[in-house]
Amino acid sequence: MNARMRFAASAAISVWLMGACANIPVPAGIASVPGVGPDKPVMTVAGELPPVPSHTWPDLNEDLNDHRADGWGLVFMPEMEKYLNGLLRKIKVATGTADWPGAVHITAQTSLNASSSAAGNIYISLGWLQSAESEDEIFAILSHEFGHIYLNHYAVYDVKNAGDTSTLIAGVTWTYVNRKVADKGWNGLDKIAVVQAIGTMALMPAWQRHIEEQADLFGATVSLRCGYSYIHGFKAFLERIDSYDRDARARNAKLREEQDNAIREKIRTDTLARAPKTPPPPAVASDAAVPLQALAAINDALTKVNGALTEGQISLNQGTFSAAQALDDAIAKGTAAIQDPHPDGAAREDDLSKEVATLIAGKRPPGRVKPWEDAKHQRRNAQTLAHYALVPDIEMLEAQHRYAEALKLAAKAASGANADDAMLDFYLGNAIALSQGRSKESPVQAFSRNLKSPERSWRLQVAIANNMASTNRQQARSFIEQQFVYFGRAPKAWPDLIAFYRDSGDVKGAKDMAMTCSVTLPDYRQACLSASQTPAELAEAKAKADAHAKIVVDNVSKRWFKQ
């Protein structure tokens, strides 16, 4: 079928499928604007789209596998994906791109994140599905992300984070990933924070605001032409970004506060347990009934803690609390601050509302709430959203060291339709390790559930392989290499496999693979090379970064042990 026939067919499908979703006019002279062409389309006015640009499409499956290997991977929600892809189909028909590749996939993130890729895929987080209140809002998100694809932003702008991110965390996070599964040196939240820091960052594009505004204008144009409400759609979408960011900052601050309090209380309790058992002095109204020796011991312990924070670690009765744990949280929060996937929501909404003012004048269609509610309340979707909604409570319980309660809640989350979900299996395994024998299931058994899922997580496969390596290196190597093939040799998985070779004694294999990576996957060059470094090489690299490390440690120590 030639291009003209395909366009005619698209128009016919548009009328048949969509009714209210009208074809969007293209300004006749836009291709002649200096610096603008079919490969570099630009939105100039609301209501009009530039001509459909030509695209060079990367491999769709490679893109999908790379996102499966990223962070917690994807969530198996076939009914929800069917609904979302129906909305994407509307967008494609309305823009004359019905034959373009790509689909909507759901990421295992409870934050508000959405992204698209040069291959044509759109990735939307569970957090958005939990938070959005109407189909208008979901359509706004999808049309915005499709705008990045249509406007060829991936080809025109250098927006990849992979190189910068791998440089930022090189020599640190890959080592953390390869810690033993049941390493009691990890606090529950530390382990979770580092996996989240490693995931999502490398593949999330670093859009500048003017690029985001182009995608906003594109999405609003498509959304309004398809009869969706601006108030319930784009306005709600952009305003929710800012309100979520405020709430997330407050919640993270509360989590850190609870974690700090629990750590300090543990130190105080251990110090009191070691204090000499001597009679207390006479009680006075202004003093607590605590032995003076114990008070002195507590003060002494806190003083030593401050010194030990920069030197190494503090031994407690259960496991080990190290300075590295404090840095884990700083790394996660620091990378999140560097990558803002949706800057300036309120300011963008102000600008966008002015651009579309003439298009929405006198038009106030009601929000399409029922279709969205029907989709969310489909049985599997409802259970999945409810189970992932338990994650913040699990994190808070772990921050408070209430591990038995955290385990009970994690077991509930990783059940039913979500028994094999990667993120929830990880939370369950983590809670099992922290609760110390309160479960018949081991952490690795919890992680291994994910092998039965249609959506495996590379991160859990790495954890399983590292655990295997402690007893059978050859079996572990065979397992992780099989998983590497299963994930289509995804670029995101290369540093982990290289680090596995290094840690299992095959330094030459690690070096050889790192060199191949540096040539064939330039975005991951630094991460691959760092993952191949031996402890001696890492120590040398660390020595060169001592000044930076001292700044980070000093900042963390001020927060963790304020008197």
Residue ranges and their predicted role:
Residues 17-20:
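C-terminal motif of bacterial Sec signal peptides marking the signal peptidase cleavage site
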